[in-house]
Amino acid sequence: MDYKTYDPDLWNAIAREEERQENNLELIASENVVSKAVMAAQGSILTNKYAEGYPGKRYYGGCEFIDIVENLAIDRAKELFGAKFANVQAHSGSQANTAAYLSLVEPGDTILGMDLSAGGHLTHGSPVNFSGKTYNFVSYGVDPSTEVIDYDVVRILAREHRPKLIVAGASAYSRTIDFKRFREIADEVDAKLMVDMAHIAGLVASGLHPNPVPYADIVTSTTHKTLRGPRGGLILTNSEELAKKVNSSIFPGIQGGPLEHVIAGKAAAFKEALDPSFAEYSQQVIANAQAMTKVFNQAPEARLISGATDNHLLLIEVTGFGLNGKEAEAILDSVNITVNKNSIPFEQLSPFKTSGIRIGTPAITSRGFKEEDAVEVAKLIVQVLKDPENTAVHDEVKAAVAALTKKYPLYN
């Protein structure tokens, strides 16, 4: 029996999700559209194989071809980011961060990381996350007037609290991060430096954002987002000693068997990112985001956090529309534009409502959108948020979205 006929509930849901992605404008900054090669690798026969251990040192037989796949991913990751060592087995960015902490600090140690509401990540010390429960996190944020990182304040906090580790990187921060400054601050207080480049890895690979690898003791990342690979994690270092700790922290520390079909997807994505065309794509991602900023900066109801973007994302306060982030997300979803509600610096609302939304351009750029298309999308967002109860406006925006998705299909 055909598997789709056997399980129609499952395959109908998958078909509807495929339809949603085809007909919606995906503006969630952490999402992208993988290539057919990445998708094929993830759906390959490698999903059948267990391979605990590392290439050449497996606990299972029959891994000779699995070793080739994993070594391809490792070697390509090292070349892509200029690192001496790479671990490609982490199932996610959070798993990568967990392994980094296990390799660098002990439970109860003090760590300096970016506050979640200022743009950090759950794994950078949020009290509801394992990181905040296991380590003594002290948070830094952004300057109230500029909404960018104040490195002088980071230095003051580091001198005051003497952390064993400083974490740089963010999940909702639109400006360039100065990793050299972070390294200097870490050295002043004899701290290690970890960089979580999950959101900007593709831009780093393309030379469009400073590379943290020369400055950090350990760099972690996801392999999706701007890198346009499968959902997974990556850990890089130039230290052989730390590489050994990272490997043992991943296996047997926090994981068992690696997902070799996902690692194959990573290898495929890394090869794509090494091609010169990927740098052109990354440049377009930034150009599209910066084109959108002009629209939001001209709309009096919208407030662009920090006033600009240097990367793929924009953080926008929407309270000027008389809305919170949850409401704005729902309104935009109703016209087939997908964003996520997001806290803003010095947030006054709960994380379930928020004052802002986060917008990213990786997915629409993968579909082929250029600056003029990004401008149109930004104008549609402003149009519907200004008049959320007007059904005529909804219909007009929906029609414009449909025209754009038809012009730029998900897969040509």
UniProtKB/Swiss-Prot annotation:
Keywords assigned: Amino-acid biosynthesis, Cytoplasm, One-carbon metabolism, Pyridoxal phosphate, Transferase
One Gene Ontology CC term in the entry: cytosol
InterPro entries: PyrdxlP-dep_Trfase, PyrdxlP-dep_Trfase_major, PyrdxlP-dep_Trfase_small, Ser_HO-MeTrfase, Ser_HO-MeTrfase-like, Ser_HO-MeTrfase_PLP_BS, SHMT-like_dom
Main location: cytoplasm
CDD domains, per the entry: SHMT
Catalytic activity field: (6R)-5,10-methylene-5,6,7,8-tetrahydrofolate + glycine + H2O = (6S)-5,6,7,8-tetrahydrofolate + L-serine
Pfam families cross-referenced by the UniProt entry: SHMT
One GO process term, biological-process aspect: glycine biosynthetic process from serine
Broadest EC class assigned to this enzyme: transferase
Essential cofactor(s): pyridoxal 5'-phosphate
Location in the cell: Cytoplasm
Residues marked Plays an important role in substrate specificity (site): 224
Pathway: One-carbon metabolism; tetrahydrofolate interconversion; Amino-acid biosynthesis; glycine biosynthesis; glycine from L-serine: step 1/1
Modified residues (N6-(pyridoxal phosphate)lysine): 225
Subunit structure: Homodimer.
PANTHER family associated with the record: SERINE HYDROXYMETHYLTRANSFERASE (PTHR11680), SERINE HYDROXYMETHYLTRANSFERASE 1 (PTHR11680:SF35)
HAMAP family to which the protein is assigned, alphabetical: SHMT
Family affiliation: Belongs to the SHMT family.
Function: Catalyzes the reversible interconversion of serine and glycine with tetrahydrofolate (THF) serving as the one-carbon carrier. This reaction serves as the major source of one-carbon groups required for the biosynthesis of purines, thymidylate, methionine, and other important biomolecules. Also exhibits THF-independent aldolase activity toward beta-hydroxyamino acids, producing glycine and aldehydes, via a retro-aldol mechanism.
Protein name: Serine hydroxymethyltransferase
